[in-house]
């Protein structure tokens, strides 16, 4: 199958090749800049090009099926003159692109809890997708981020519905442009809740996402769902079964089976 295929089922199959993973290398210039400055480097386009070239120019084809790029990187080249996209394609690696434009606060007046967010970028997405496809991208990533409220031990219904609707709209647009969408409804692990709370919220979030996707006519074999393991919050101090990886695996599978 060509790395420039437009068959979404084939793209999904290739990205899920046995023994390979997807390289998440879509750091924004500001996020990358913090690392560069810490290493004593200036955060300039040229420095970012050199940094990214270290891995896009490496021999990754044996372990990586796809690489998610920041939009800036689609136009950058290695020192030998090949574009990053060309270098990845030469190894049979599919190119993806981060398409969301970050998070923005939700208003309490809509029923959201303090600190909850939705994701920016839908307004300009269709135009950008056409450009990304022309540049060789065949899959995309959009991240929603939902914290579990420390007072309520849950995510507000408003945040769940808003983020699920945005993910579904994004997926529909991607598919229309021959780009496979990675749907990422991330539930943040901040907090002191146990795994049971996370399980309940995972079921709510995944269930609403599946509903929103189906409502828009999105075929589930034309997306990749990126979700997390069902775990306690990072500040949880308890003991017992939630310390056991087998428990986490079982509850994660249960959440997926009950919703997807």
What residue spans do the PLM features occupy?
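Alpha/beta catalytic barrel-like cores
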Residues: 1-137, 148, 241-242, 251-258
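Short, ordered loop/turn segments at secondary-structure junctions
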Residues: 28, 72, 144-147, 186-188, ...
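Alpha-helix N-cap and loop-to-helix initiation/capping positions
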Residues: 42-43, 116-124, 155-163, 193-205, ...
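Conserved, mostly hydrophobic/aromatic
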Residues: 44, 142, 183, 225
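Conserved radical SAM core fold
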Residues: 102-106, 146-152, 188-192, 232
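Structured alpha-helical segments in the cores of large, soluble enzyme domains
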Residues: 122-139, 163-179, 205-216, 249-258
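Active-site acidic/histidine proton-transfer and metal-coordination neighborhood
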Residues: 157-182, 186, 190, 195-200
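Active-site capping/gating regions of soluble enzymes
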Residues: 193-260
């Amino acid at each position: 199958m060509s790395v420039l295929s437009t068959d979404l089922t084939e793209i999904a199959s290739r990205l899920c090749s046995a023994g390979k993973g997807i390289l998440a290398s879509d750091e924004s210039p500001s996020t990358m800049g913090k690392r560069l400055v810490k290493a004593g480097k200036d955060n300039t386009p040229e420095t970012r090009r050199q940094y990214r070239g270290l891995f896009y120019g490496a021999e990754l084809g044996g372990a990586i099926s796809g690489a998610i790029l920041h939009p800036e990187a689609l136009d950058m080249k290695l020192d030998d003159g090949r574009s990053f996209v060309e270098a990845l394609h030469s190894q049979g690696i599919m190119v993806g692109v981060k398409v969301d434009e970050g998070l923005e606060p939700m208003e309490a007046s809509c029923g959201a809890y303090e600190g909850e967010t939705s994701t920016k970028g839908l307004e300009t997405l269709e135009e950008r997708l056409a450009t990304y496809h022309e540049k060789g991208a065949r899959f995309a990533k959009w991240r929603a981020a939902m914290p579990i409220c420390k007072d309520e031990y849950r995510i507000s219904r408003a945040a769940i519905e808003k983020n699920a609707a945005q993910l579904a709209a994004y997926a529909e647009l991607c598919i229309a442009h021959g780009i496979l969408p990675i749907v990422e409804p991330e539930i943040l692990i901040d907090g002191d809740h146990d795994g049971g709370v996370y399980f309940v919220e995972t079921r709510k979030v995944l269930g609403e996402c599946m509903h929103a996707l189906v409502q828009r006519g999105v075929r589930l074999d034309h997306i990749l769902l990126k979700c997390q393991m069902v775990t306690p919050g990072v500040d949880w101090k308890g003991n017992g079964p939630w310390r056991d990886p087998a428990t986490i695996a079982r509850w994660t599978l249960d959440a997926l089976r009950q919703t997807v």
